[in-house]
Regions:
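Nuclease and nuclease-like effector domains acting on nucleic acids or nucleotide cofactors
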Residues: 1-96, 132-152
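Histidine-centered nuclease catalytic patch
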Residues: 85-122
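Short loop/turn segments at secondary-structure transitions that flank enzyme active sites
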Residues: 112, 126-131
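Short coil/turn segments at secondary-structure boundaries
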Residues: 118-121, 127, 135-139
Length: 152
């Protein structure tokens, strides 16, 4: 069958959606286990964490001015029409540098809470990296490691 596939006209098949969800949940579980096992400040999510972090603060200075926006992410602000364009431009700069940069990932909205249905949003992998790199550098994920360490 050699028909051309048009992603704009493709239907979201339930099975494909389930596969994406399973993969995203697996990624979240693995990341949580890393946070519990390794001090977050020493955790590297990509080979270019520092570059991503510096570029993020330069392209999105509001997060540098107000780190609480990294701690508790407002999904409406993040996914606003204005910010969609900014994020699209930012993420595309990493197309050849970060593997699976557009793949869907689960991101906790409030860093102080676990992955739950109410505290999770679906974002491109690059946004996950940006916020979790920032959270790790700012010590916002330390509580996960400290809690796991003290319960052993």
């Amino acid at each position: 069958m050699s028909t051309k596939f048009d992603p704009e006209k493709a239907e979201n098949l339930e099975e494909i959606e389930k596969q994406f969800a399973v993969k995203a949940v697996g990624h979240a579980q693995t990341y949580w286990q890393l946070l519990e096992a390794v001090p977050p400040k020493s955790l590297k999510l990509t080979k270019i964490d520092d570059e991503i972090y510096d570029d993020f603060l330069e392209q999105f200075p509001e997060y540098k001015a107000n780190p609480s926006m990294v701690e508790v992410i407002d999904e409406n602000v993040l996914k606003s029409q204005e910010n969609k364009q900014r994020w699209f431009k930012f993420m595309n700069a990493y197309e050849k540098k970060v593997q699976d940069y557009t793949f869907g990932s689960l991101l906790r909205m409030n860093v102080k809470e676990d992955y739950t249905e109410k505290n999770t949003m679906f974002v491109p992998r690059m946004q996950f990296y940006v916020f979790e790199i920032a959270r790790n550098k700012l010590g916002m994920n330390d509580h996960v490691y400290d809690s796991a360490k003290s319960s052993k």
